[in-house]
């Protein structure tokens, strides 16, 4: 045997015997046996039997595929209120995954508490929402008082990004129980009573939904009494656009995916993380079967083989509602259903981006993909994927049964359709307001919110959540819809409207959302990762370095991979365009206002 063909484990640096081949040392038989024994062992930290048994007890007979990694991490995190290293090592062994893969996923998501084996998991965690709406309602003062009031070493109080309950601001979440209009006393009472789970919500159940005509459209499609092409045409004619923020025409998306090769998949996005947005949660808590029917109609028309529903982890109560509704549907439906899997997010805002959500469903870090290819062609598990926001599917049944003209017949100021506005901030009656597309902010507040809160005058507003920009009261008569706000440096997105008054400053709102973006950047691309953090630092100065901030805004907008980094500069640009008096060092300069106390001129 020539030296060049000799197995590497036979070539040693020293040995008791030598061959006749100059420069080559051959191992002894005992050394070869020891080398073979070592090569059969795993390298790195090994799982201990006790931890393996604890992990097995939690995941049971559930699949060990990579795409359920996050589900298994949730089970461990819930049971032990944290992820100790020993459990992560054991899970890696059980799932036959590299430990690095398990650790990098566990450390990516905010809701996973990765602990050293010597660390003690917190007995109870209270999360105080520091989103803009809660900040306006006194979240900072709540955060300051709670640690002293609670006085428990085993109770941890931390700040958390928007929890999707802005109409109830301020909000604190005691383990999984959201405390609305939270005061220190209400939170302390929930802690002392160990009231840590969400209260059950009353919703339209399967029988009540069927009694008023629910699931009839799905049954007619399966029976051939309704035609898929007619349904698709109705969707196209209605003008319904994606209501998660992107605004892509829903019917066109159905047709694109329908033309792709099989198998085709569907991913439903209920990771409602845009600060100020709570419409999906509100509808899901009240009428889950209307959404499920729209989902099944889309699946039938497009030819979907499996559906994955990605639900925001903050929505613990919704998870119970949706689990029950799916169980009712699967046991009562008289027609075949595609496979439906409910997946749980883990506190990463970036997973609201469609490709990041797909990465998360596949059990990976939620990092956006480069495009093309688009997920309609290469999506979940490499298959053509129909991705939809919850509310988009919620309206499918009404549009098809009432006709495309029913939906498109609504609208104001030349716009068509309906929009669900999540309104919070300085108004008397915050909440989800179903209103005609194209309604102005002034009309929305006067007609649907009972006017401005007492003692408050309209000063500014965010028309599209954290990323949609900030507009002054002088632009309160601009129609609110897709494509109407871009000329003013803003967009409507998910229609999360946060109203500011003369008691607030736009620069403070911009800083709040920029800090949010800095915390939520996935870190994949430098312009977003570094730019958001640097911008948040610069925005704290009494006088802004406008040139540097505009340079940062340009780089982030041009070079970021996904919408987070591209839209993060919007609040900066808006403050510099409409509220320069707040950041240029002029003392006590009031902006020009065109409204007296209240909203109506």
Regions from the language model: what does each represent?
Residues 230-264:
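N-terminal glycine-rich phosphate/pyrophosphate-binding loops that anchor nucleotide-derived ligands
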Residues 109, 287-301:
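Histidine-anchored nucleotide/phosphate-binding helix
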Residues 319-437, 449:
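Hydrophobic alpha-helical positions that pack around
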Residues 450-465:
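Short loop-to-beta-strand transition segments
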Residues 210-216, 268-280, 375-380, 422-427:
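Gly-rich Lys/Arg/Thr-decorated short loops/hinges at beta-loop-alpha junctions or inter-strand turns
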Residues 294-296, 437-453:
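Short amphipathic, charge-patterned alpha-helical segments
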Residues 9, 21, 35-126, 130-163, ...:
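Ferredoxin-type iron-sulfur electron-transfer modules in oxidoreductases and energy-metabolism complexes
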